[in-house]
């Protein structure tokens, strides 16, 4: 089959975040199975993302995709879909109407506009793919899509690629227990809760260290909170890094923490488990579907630095528990291998 992937999300790990990773992993997996994939990316950028997304979609009307099946990611395809001549699948990597609930001000207002476009997109699609049962429920409840038109296809991970990167990564000698977090700095990621947790944890584990990979609109506010808590070199902000450098951070950490209160899936959780890291995260949104509590790590109530600190201490001070969670995490990550997820995608797309 020939697929046209429609996406106005920047195709770079720096700006596209987990959406970029998921699209690229799926593209490679489908091509490995003998299918053709043409990505129709965003080419012209004004600096105003919502405007760019509308212009991109207007352009699809003027130059329609040529394929057996078109796949529009998130809101993409919403203008073209009403006059399409080929099957159309809407693949939602995150539900915009759900994500905006944790945003503020101008960002929330712009996301509200995008959510209306996404609603139109899923209404016009022959099939709607989501990454988790949680997202399926949100799409049915908020966008009014009947459950029979929705299929769950999780995010894929290229285990062979990551295992190669882990094997080549530099191991740095360190006596300090190290926590790693990888996230775009949005309010919904709740990284301030992790900073608070580290401040509490230092009273019990004075040498604990937190490395944060990622950037975003909350960056300045997090730096100010870091200073106010007096965390000093206990926290390192690494910004955006290459995949090779990210692999190095994974193999040099003792534990992975993502305190997010809203995740449609959480592809970084797969990456961390593939690296054998025990997970501490929040019992929120789709996270429990990816991280079984007490099997690959610990899930705690959202917005609770105290419970985060307790769970982190439990893992960092128990080497046997770290190993058991890490081994289980590797097995769990293997359940989302890219070839298997690509097959699930194909089955769902053929029903469009």
Task: For the regions a language model picked out, list residue spans one by one.
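Carbohydrate-associated surface elements
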Residues: 134, 156
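Aromatic "clamp/platform" in nucleotide-sugar-dependent glycosyltransferases that forms part
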Residues: 261
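Membrane-proximal helix-turn-helix segments that form the acceptor-binding/catalytic region
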Residues: 109-128
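Short alpha-helical donor nucleotide-sugar binding micro-motif in glycosyltransferases
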Residues: 240-241, 248-253
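Conserved donor-binding/catalytic core segment of Leloir-type glycosyltransferases
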Residues: 171-198, 211
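Active-site proximal beta-strand in glycosyltransferases
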Residues: 69-71, 83-101, 129
